[in-house]
Curated annotation (Swiss-Prot):
It comes from Chlorobaculum parvum (strain DSM 263 / NCIMB 8327) (Chlorobium vibrioforme subsp. thiosulfatophilum). This is Serine--tRNA ligase. Consists of two distinct domains, a catalytic core and a N-terminal extension that is involved in tRNA binding. It is an enzyme of class 6 (ligase). It catalyses: tRNA(Ser) + L-serine + ATP = L-seryl-tRNA(Ser) + AMP + diphosphate + H(+); tRNA(Sec) + L-serine + ATP = L-seryl-tRNA(Sec) + AMP + diphosphate + H(+). Homodimer. The tRNA molecule binds across the dimer.
Length: 427
């Protein structure tokens, strides 16, 4: 959430940000917000004036009664009217503040100055790579669907029977390979990269979604259980960030870094017409998430560190990849800056997104009220929050199966995963 003081002082800058994000239609929200803010200021002043009048006259009434100069009934009657006015103003103020908050919640984050200008994903910029690793694929490669079916690793048909399209079933060595990936990533991030592992709930309340920015902007993308007021998480970022919602963090404990595995659930509303075969677009997938809470001046250094931690996984697995910087028209509403890591699919002959690494600056912390006191004293400030997929397994599995296949239809297990799987080859 943006600081309303910043919006008051820089309304045109906010509108320019909306233009860069291809959200110029939301510019009237800025004017409406400032109008409501001015109304609130006037209403607060009127309320304060009436309360001051009531306090002053209450003292006069007490003095009249104490000195025996009368009953003060006329003044008491007037103050009852004043109290009724104050009650009406308080009610109106509460409604107005709710409207202001809802407007603030719908505005996207500021963009970092280094975010490139662009209208869509076609204008994203290569940041690093391509990073290549040698794989002997001098034969007609099979795609992950054919490999998964022929080797008994994946069963999309039975997943569709059980739940619906986009809910895969891992079977046999496919299930063990998936679990090996998750455990390898968690172990690497906790042992080598300094993250504390957490295992969060897969269901959250609306306050948690609001805190990380998925609500109300992306309400149509989450699965909702209305009877319980709960939502299936789209990413572990939501519960892990909300671990510290409403808390004052200790300055000397920053940065705080968590790594968490979770299943992720996304409705993928609006994906009609996109390639939804196999793992290319699913409603449920597994992911290891990295979440960081930092001092503001350290957050862009932390962004590069998180990116390097995600890259380290791909380097260990020897999966070819590249890193792109998302342009202003493609970056998520919550992020101030974002990198995407894309893995190469030889069968699809294209890159597939496997990770996003984002700096939200104080956007989530302001929504979630996560603060710290610099030096342990003084005025509290909002921390900066960051997150990165480290990594999502679905498209990673696509690239892994396709790169590690052999001419005779087997899959060689990456060396770093063999201690986890207990086997070297899938046949």
């Amino acid at each position: 959430m943006l600081d309303i003081s910043y919006i008051r002082q820089n309304p045109e800058e906010v509108k320019e940000m909306l233009r860069r994000r291809q959200q110029s239609d939301d510019a009237p929200k800025v004017d409406r917000l400032l109008e409501r803010d001015a109304e609130r200021k006037a209403m607060v002043q009127r309320t304060d004036d009436l309360k001051a009048l009531r306090n002053r006259v209450s003292k006069e009434i007490a003095n009249i009664k104490r000195t025996g100069q009368g009953s003060g009934e006329e003044l008491i009657s007037q103050m009852k009217e004043v109290s009724d006015q104050i009650a009406d103003l308080d009610l109106g103020l509460s409604t107005l503040e709710g409207e202001i908050e809802e407007l603030l919640l719908t505005l996207p984050n500021k963009l970092h100055e280094s975010v490139p200008e662009g209208r869509s994903a076609d204008e994203n910029i290569l940041y690093k790579g391509p990073v290549s690793f040698e794989h002997n694929l001098d034969f007609p490669v099979k795609d992950h669907l054919e490999l998964g079916k022929s080797l008994g690793l994946l069963d999309f048909e039975r997943g569709a029977k059980i739940t619906g399209a986009g809910f895969p079933v891992y079977t046999g060595k496919g299930a063990r390979l998936e679990r090996a990936l998750i455990n390898f990533m968690l172990d690497t991030h906790s042992a080598n990269h300094g993250y504390t592992e957490v295992f969060p709930p897969f269901m959250v309340n609306k306050e948690s979604l609001r805190g990380t920015g998925q609500w109300p902007k992306f309400a149509d993308q989450v699965y909702h259980m209305p009877e319980d007021g709960l939502y299936a998480i789209p990413t572990a970022e939501v519960p892990v960030t909300n671990l510290h919602r409403g808390e004052m963090l200790e300055d000397d404990k920053l940065p705080i870094a968590y790594a968490a595995y979770s299943a992720c659930f996304r409705r993928e509303a609006g994906s009609y017409g996109k390639d939804t075969r196999g793992f290319l677009r699913v409603h449920q997938f597994n992911k290891v998430e990295m979440v960081r809470f930092t001092r503001p001046e350290k957050s862009y250094e932390a962004l590069e560190e998180i990116l390097s931690h995600a890259e380290a996984i791909l380097c260990a697995l020897k999966i070819p990849y590249r890193v792109i910087t998302l342009c202003s028209g493609d970056i998520s509403a919550n992020a101030a800056k974002c990198y995407d890591i894309e893995v190469w699919s030889p069968a699809e002959n294209k890159y597939l997104e496997a990770s996003s690494v984002s700096n939200f600056e104080d956007y989530q912390a302001r929504r979630s009220n996560i603060r710290f006191k610099p030096g342990g004293k003084g005025k509290p400030e909002f921390v900066h929050t960051l997150n990165g997929s480290g990594l999502a397994t679905s498209r990673l599995m696509v690239s892994l199966l396709e790169h590690y296949q052999t001419a005779d239809g087997k899959i060689m297990v990456p060396e770093v995963l063999r201690p986890y799987t207990g086997f070297d080859v899938i046949e």
